[in-house]
Swiss-Prot record:
It holds the Pfam family DUF5323. Its main location: plastid. Belongs to the chloroplast-specific ribosomal protein cL38 family. The gene is PSRP6. Residues 44-59 have a biased composition (Basic residues). Keywords: Chloroplast, Plastid, Ribonucleoprotein, Ribosomal protein, Transit peptide. This is Large ribosomal subunit protein cL38. One of its GO terms (cellular component) is plastid. Residues 1-39 form a transit peptide. It comes from the Eukaryota.
Amino acid sequence: MSVSAIFGTGIVTVAASPVLRQFQVPKLGNGGGLGMVIECSSRPQKKSTAHHRKTRPKKTQPWDIKRKPTVYAPLPPLPAEWSPFTLASDDGGAATAAGDLVSGAA
């Protein structure tokens, strides 16, 4: 049973005799007979990204702090079928349409 379940429930008392009435637990709230009401949590749970950033390993060693990103060799040139091309024709409209298709503006 969680702590919020214990404090969020009302306390049942038996008021059969005047002797028991003096030992009743005073009710809190606006007189509606509610027990203690939990309004908000003082330590809310972090969302997943905030938790990941908070709990990830920290760089504490000088060699790790000063470490640079890995330098990779440059990629080879693209094959001919992946290269952009232009149409060499007298019709300016067809060349413009082909240029739009290659650039992805269409």
